[in-house]
């Protein structure tokens, strides 16, 4: 997830003001991805031509004869990005489901959490990011996720019951100039890059020179998320906004409590399963 900005890059950005999105992305150094391939399902040369694995299923989706699902690695080894080739939430929209109890607003998220080993689900404009539990195998999870996504989009059901656009970077009447500039940079320059890695970054507040941000999707548990904040996001914000002294990652306490309860529940289930073979027979 690391995104580094050199001094030369910053000088170029200064000369071009905010510059183009492509320019900023190139300076941010989008993390390279390793290809996931599904040899049994590919036409010869498809993976090489597209730079990532393709799975083709003969299933009618939105008037199409076939649905192509691409899988793309993220900088987080426990998160994988699925691109169904159709809009998921539409341009600029994201929605995070850090655990199963938060999936009540999405029929698709509910189905994905039923797949054994799935820990988190994240929806982007045209992708779904799946985060797996530690120790779970992608070779077992991927086929089930493929099936769920294809069946769901074939059904024509809405992804969300009440789809709402991101509001954290919406300019409010009481926002001062510094906050407005922070929101603008996050929304137009930083978030698009983070979303390409299968996650998102949410503005949680600004106080006394400190910008508070929340990482979502593949970024939430990525080992290099702190490096991303300090060497990428913080550098860019400080360059354009001198008032910014530092960037801090914040966590949702409610999510932490739910995650803790889930981990405890899973440990209890594993303990029970391990005890079953040595347990007493039927009475």
Curated annotation (Swiss-Prot):
MF annotations from Gene Ontology: iron ion binding; iron-sulfur cluster binding
Signal peptide residue numbers: none
Annotated [4Fe-4S] cluster binding sites: 219, 222
Cell location: Mitochondrion
Chief place where the protein resides: mitochondrion
Keywords: Iron, Iron-sulfur, Metal-binding, Mitochondrion, Transit peptide
SMART domains: Nfu_N
Transit peptide stretch: 1-30
InterPro entries in alphabetical order: FSCA_dom_sf, Nfu/NifU_N, Nfu/NifU_N_sf, NIF_FeS_clus_asmbl_NifU_C, RNA-helicase_DEAD-box_CS
Any single biological process term in GO: iron-sulfur cluster assembly
GO cellular component: mitochondrion
Region (NifU): 182-250
Family to which the UniProt record says this protein belongs: Belongs to the NifU family.
Function: Molecular scaffold for [Fe-S] cluster assembly of mitochondrial iron-sulfur proteins.
Name this polypeptide is given: NFU1 iron-sulfur cluster scaffold homolog, mitochondrial
Native organism: Drosophila erecta (Fruit fly)
């Amino acid at each position: 997830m690391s995104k580094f900005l050199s001094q030369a890059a910053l000088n170029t950005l200064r000369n071009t003001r905010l510059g183009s999105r492509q320019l900023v992305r190139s300076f941010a150094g989008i993390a390279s991805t390793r290809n996931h391939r599904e040899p049994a399902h590919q036409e010869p040369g498809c993976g090489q031509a597209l730079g990532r694995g393709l799975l083709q299923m003969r299933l009618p989706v939105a008037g199409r004869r076939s649905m192509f699902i691409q899988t793309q690695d993220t900088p987080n080894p426990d998160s994988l990005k699925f691109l169904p080739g159709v809009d998921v939430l539409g341009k600029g929209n994201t929605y995070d489901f850090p655990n199963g109890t938060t999936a009540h607003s999405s029929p698709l998220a509910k189905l994905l959490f039923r797949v054994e080993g799935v820990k988190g689900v994240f929806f982007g404009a045209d992708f779904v990011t799946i985060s797996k539990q530690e120790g779970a195998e992608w070779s077992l999870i991927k086929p089930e996720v493929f099936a769920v996504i294809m069946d769901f989009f074939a059904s024509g059901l809405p992804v969300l019951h009440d789809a709402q656009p991101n509001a954290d970077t919406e300019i409010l009447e009481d926002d001062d100039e510094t906050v407005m500039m922070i929101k603008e940079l996050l929304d137009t320059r930083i978030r698009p890059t983070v979303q390409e890695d299968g996650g998102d970054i949410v503005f949680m507040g600004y106080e006394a020179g400190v910008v508070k941000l929340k990482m979502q999707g593949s970024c939430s548990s990525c080992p290099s998320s702190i490096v991303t904040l300090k060497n990428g996001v913080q550098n860019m914000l400080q360059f354009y906004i001198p008032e910014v002294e530092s960037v801090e990652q914040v966590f949702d306490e409610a999510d932490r409590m739910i995650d803790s309860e889930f981990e405890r529940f899973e440990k209890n289930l594993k303990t029970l399963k391990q005890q079953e073979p040595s347990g007493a027979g039927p009475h």
